[in-house]
Structures are given as C-alpha cells and as structure tokens.
C-alpha cells in the first residue's frame, strides 16, 4: 500500500492573478488571488489546501509533502497547522525555481526515499475513488488516472474549451499507457472507442520517475521541464510498467478567479475531518 503523497503547490498562479470580468469576490478571495496563492485560496472559510490534504488522508495517504517556493512561509505554517490538528505527517520540500512539474517532483526525491508515492496538484480536488485506488496498490508499477472527457465535463467546473489545455493519453487494450501529449493542438485525434482520456496530474509513481525527470529537456515552446515528458520517457523505457486507472468522475479545478464561485458551490456540503 502507498502511504506517501506529493502535492505540487509551487506554481506562480499567473492565471489566478488576472482580473476576471463579471466575477464578484470577497476581499479575502482577492488577496489570495493577487498573490497567486491557489492552495491557500479560502473556500467557505477553509483554504483549498485543507480540502486537498483531507482527501489524501481519507484515502490512506498519511504522509504528505508539499512542494513549495523558498519564500512560501504561509505554506509552511499551513503544513504545521494541519499536522497538529489532523494527526498526520505534513512536510515541505522546496523547488527553488518554477522550472516545471518534473522539477517539482524532483524536489520531493528525499521525501519519497525509495518508496512509491502519489502525485497531485495543489489546485485540484480529486475523486476519492481514484485516490483510494492508487493508495491501495501493492505492486511497484506506475499509474496515471485517465479522466474521461465527458465525465469531466459532466461532473467538474471545467469548460469544454479548457480540455485542450491538459494532456491527452493513448491507452492499449490491456490498460497500458502508450502515449501522453501535453496540450495537443488537435485533441480529437486521441479519441478511442468514444473516449478521450485526459491527464489531470494524478499519478502513482515508482522511484524510477526521478531518473526520467532528470533525463528530459525543457519543452521548446513552454520552456519548462514537464512531468508528461518524464512519463513519456518511462513509457518508452518500458520498465516499470505504466498503466492507466480509468475514471469517469469529475475534478474540481481552481485555476482562475472565475473558478472560485463554482468551487464554493461544489464544496457546500463537504465536511472536513480536521
């Protein structure tokens, strides 16, 4: 069973900092938005991070590492607070520069310490079924959760035009991941048997991911070390095996200011364990 989780929370939050026409926010929301602090965005009186960590804890992932910026003292304080009240181990790893998601995972190598671990975003809230399935795995293989496009559109606050901003996947009949492409220009070419499997950065990794992260080069357009490139490298190598966990559930997304009202509506009945 996997008990460790890495939460990528180093992003600059540039889209959250942009004004959103027609969206009325509280002063508390605006302060967090101006700072680009998506993980600390207050939602119904609790920061987004509390919901993210609570989901991990409920899935059995009791040892959590937050990947943060060097100057993110508020995140360090949040980690200490949650550790104290939730009875879990919450620690931080520093990503010195915002060089991309692969670099964020590398920042947590000491935390992983040779164990398998789950990786997720700090500005997404994932379905408990998918998290639990990853946590219960007993093997040493890698997994990525493939979210069905139609399920995302039905059960998330994600608009259809935003699907192209994520990575698309190709999957073999036996469930092996065969390809993953970040922000493809034509997502329809990845539809198979009526499904487009979308990557929302929810993984279960073996330690081999770290060597793959070190082996890649920055994307020539976005100039970042992208985790999808490291995943593609592991798929190319063939070991460890990389399989897809399929989900037709939704993912709560907190990318921009316009997502905040929808996020609060979605969380209206949510009760945290700490």
Predicted regions mapped to residue ranges:
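Hydrophobic packing residues within well-ordered alpha-helices of enzyme cores
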Residues: 16, 75-79, 134, 213, ...
């Amino acid at each position: 069973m996997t008990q460790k989780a890495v939460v990528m929370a180093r992003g600059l939050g540039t889209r959250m900092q942009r004004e959103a026409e027609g969206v009325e926010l509280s002063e508390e929301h605006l302060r967090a938005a101006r700072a680009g602090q998506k993980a600390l965005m207050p939602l119904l009186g609790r920061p987004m991070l509390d919901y993210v960590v609570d989901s991990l804890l409920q899935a059995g992932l009791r040892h959590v590492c937050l990947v943060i910026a060097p100057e993110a003292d508020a995140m360090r304080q949040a980690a200490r607070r949650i550790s104290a009240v939730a009875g879990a181990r919450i620690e931080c790893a520093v990503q010195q520069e915002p060089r991309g998601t692969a670099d964020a995972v590398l920042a947590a190598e000491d935390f992983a310490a040779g164990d398998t671990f789950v990786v997720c975003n700090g500005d997404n809230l994932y379905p408990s079924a998918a998290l639990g399935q990853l946590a219960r795995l007993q093997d040493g293989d890698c997994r990525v959760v493939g979210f069905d496009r139609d399920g995302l559109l039905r059960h998330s606050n994600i608009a259809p035009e935003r699907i192209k901003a994520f990575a698309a996947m190709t999957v073999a009949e036996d469930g092996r991941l065969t390809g993953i492409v970040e922000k493809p220009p034509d997502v329809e070419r990845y539809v198979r048997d009526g499904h487009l499997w979308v990557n929302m950065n929810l993984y279960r990794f073996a330690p081999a991911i770290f060597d793959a992260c070190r082996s890649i080069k920055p994307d020539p357009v976005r100039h970042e070390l992208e985790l999808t490139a490291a995943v593609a490298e592991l798929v190319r190598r063939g070991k460890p095996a990389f399989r897809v966990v399929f989900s037709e559930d939704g993912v709560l997304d907190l990318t921009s200011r316009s997502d905040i009202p929808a996020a609060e509506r979605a969380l209206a009945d949510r009760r945290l364990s700490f």
